[in-house]
Amino acid sequence: MSAKGSFTLGMLSIIAAIGLFTAANGFAADAHTTTKFEGVKANSGTATHGRQGNNDTLTWSEDFKIPDTPAPHWQVVDTKGNVFLLQRLKIKGDKENRTITIPSYVHDVAKVQIYCSWAEALLGEASFAKPIVTASGERMHSDSMAMSR
């Protein structure tokens, strides 16, 4: 192979590698993971934010253990300090709400908490490095930008 052919092949390889790296980072940008849960009863695992279309989801990690309390629930806190009580972790028939959809009225998420609604006690919480803006939060922001023009 000539020097020119080797150079062209090398450049194509570099361009392909950059393209793969950029694509991989684009997919990873949709997934955000919290710190480890810490609290009185919830001390393991993390939660991961994902987006499927216009729906934002939270999923707990494989190493998360559901606290042994009567009614543990998902709960999120937004950047303004508003707290939203969401689904139970355990449901009928030993099923689990491992992944939940964040309601559209929640516009951002700063913390994910595990809350016992029976005892009205916080069992543990985990934070995102940066607050997550949900799809509804993005729409609300873009609508307010359009109205200000």
Describe the function of each predicted region.
Residues 26-53, 86, 131-149:
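Transition segment at domain starts
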Residues 58-64:
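Short amphipathic, basic-aromatic surface patches that mediate peripheral association
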